[in-house]
């Protein structure tokens, strides 16, 4: 196995996908070098662009190997740097369920959550129909989750990759489209996520950047 100290993460603490990966690191207290992507460190921005010209982040470098996409980064950590908290079950069927839920949170919560954010920074102030569609999509996702949550965590009794995705997506989704009283299990699940040390650490690390949230960050969480 490669040494944990070989890990360098290019990320920003207010990014939902970066938080998703950082939660995985914090769950297993895995040491890594954090390169903040921002005007504070122009060199980090240049390095990330050279490592991954498509421009997305987070980007992980492990002993010279570049790893991209948040879910793949977490699976890479599980494969090469396993810790006491198993974020992906060894049982193939259980692992498939976790991977599905990871995709659910990224595609059906994170993506529509970002639509109003991006629309709000358009020069014309955003398209009302896009905002409305995002609200419907999030309510639909909340309802599906309300109907399928059967344990304390997304896939059941254990905290997994799916919860890393859920924490980052539901944290911001509730700012964009509040999780109403019609979804008590989802509200309680979000509260459990925010109370988990790895997640609360990410929330605190991102707090100084809340003024960047285009829709205005609520005075809570």
Please name every model-derived segment:
Residues 12, 38, 161, 206-207:
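Short, solvent-exposed turn/loop segments enriched in Gly/Ser/Thr/Pro and often Arg
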Residues 105-197, 202-204:
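GST-like fold's C-terminal all-alpha helical module
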Residues 2-132, 136-139, 152-154, 220:
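GST-like domain detector, emphasizing the conserved glutathione-binding G-site
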Residues 206-221:
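Acidic/histidine-enriched, glycine/proline-rich intrinsically disordered or flexible terminal extensions
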Residues 90, 201-209:
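Short, flexible loop/turn segments with low-complexity composition
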Residues 11, 18, 35, 143, ...:
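Compositionally biased, intrinsically disordered low-complexity regions enriched in proline and serine
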Residues 45, 122, 179, 212-214:
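Residue-level signature of transmembrane alpha-helix interfaces in integral membrane proteins
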């Amino acid at each position: 196995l490669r040494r944990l100290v070989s890990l360098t993460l290019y990320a920003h603490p207010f990014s939902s996908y970066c938080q998703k990966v950082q939660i995985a690191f914090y769950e297993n207290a895995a040491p890594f070098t954090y390169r903040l992507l921002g005007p504070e460190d122009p060199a980090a921005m240049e390095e990330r662009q050279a490592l991954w010209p498509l421009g997305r982040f987070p980007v992980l470098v492990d002993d010279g190997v570049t790893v991209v996409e948040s879910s793949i980064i977490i699976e890479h950590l599980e494969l090469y740097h396993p810790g006491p908290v198993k974020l992906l079950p060894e049982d193939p069927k259980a692992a498939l369920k976790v991977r599905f839920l990871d995709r659910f949170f990224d595609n059906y919560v994170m993506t529509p959550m970002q639509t109003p954010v991006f629309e709000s920074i358009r020069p014309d102030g955003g398209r009302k129909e896009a905002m409305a569609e995002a609200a419907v999509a999030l309510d639909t996702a909340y309802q599906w989750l309300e109907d399928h949550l059967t344990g304390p965590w997304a896939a059941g009794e254990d905290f997994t990759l799916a919860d890393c995705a859920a924490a980052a997506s539901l944290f911001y989704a509730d700012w964009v489209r509040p999780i109403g009283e019609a979804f008590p299990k989802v509200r309680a699940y979000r509260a459990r996520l925010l109370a988990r040390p790895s997640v609360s650490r990410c929330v605190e690390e991102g707090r100084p950047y809340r003024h960047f949230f285009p829709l205005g960050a609520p005075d809570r969480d």
